[in-house]
């Protein structure tokens, strides 16, 4: 099977399996999506969704959070991973978003990554989910599944290299959905530890069947 055939097979499978797919994070506007995505770094979406209702009720937009003290925001996010750093970044992000962008979410990689606490992966989530632009956010699940399914080479050993290879081979119209397909497959089937290979419907093309990790 050529790489092109591999991509076609896998994308066709997911397109039929999950024709409609999006993030599992809960949000009501662009600011809230950015906050939830920042909180989700090295933390489960389920945990983030437990803390954001109260957080968003108190700080529904950037202008409100920009006025907050870090300690105040920390009280709402203390159950997520790295709460101190994340609370600090959230307040600083809200302040910059308010002061430099008038509360409007920037829609480019360069501008998004100027915001405190916003890296390439988070920016790609915003571009794909909120702005519906062709973008590929590579988290630990996407990275792992891409390698196991042979979508990328062993030399693609960084998230950005994986992103580049995926974007070269996935049609722009499918890029944002493909991110969610790979992520959800990694989250629920192709897990890091004890992957559910017996439940995997595309194991025939897996390059690492029954991996130990």
What do these predicted ranges mean?
Residues 2-213:
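Catalytic cores of DNA base-excision repair glycosylases
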């Amino acid at each position: 099977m050529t790489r092109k055939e591999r991509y076609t097979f896998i994308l066709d499978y997911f397109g039929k399996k999950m024709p409609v797919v999006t993030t599992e994070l809960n949000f009501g506007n662009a600011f809230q999506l950015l906050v939830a995505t920042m909180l989700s770094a090295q933390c489960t979406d389920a945990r983030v969704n437990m803390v954001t209702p109260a957080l968003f009720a108190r700080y529904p937009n950037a202008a409100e959070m920009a006025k907050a003290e870090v300690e105040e925001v920390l009280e709402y996010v203390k159950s997520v991973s790295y709460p101190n750093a994340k609370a600090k970044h959230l307040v600083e992000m809200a302040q910059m978003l308010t002061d430099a962008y008038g509360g409007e979410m920037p829609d480019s990689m360069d501008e998004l990554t100027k915001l405190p606490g916003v890296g390439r992966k988070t920016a790609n989530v915003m571009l794909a989910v909120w702005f519906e632009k062709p973008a590929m956010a590579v988290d630990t699940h996407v990275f792992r599944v891409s390698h196991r399914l042979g979508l990328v080479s062993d030399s693609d050993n960084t998230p950005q290299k994986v992103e580049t290879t995926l974007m070269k081979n996935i049609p722009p119209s499918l890029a944002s959905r493909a991110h969610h397909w790979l992520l959800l497959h990694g989250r629920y089937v192709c897990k890091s530890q004890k992957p559910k290979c017996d439940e995997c419907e595309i194991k025939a093309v897996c390059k690492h069947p029954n991996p130990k990790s």
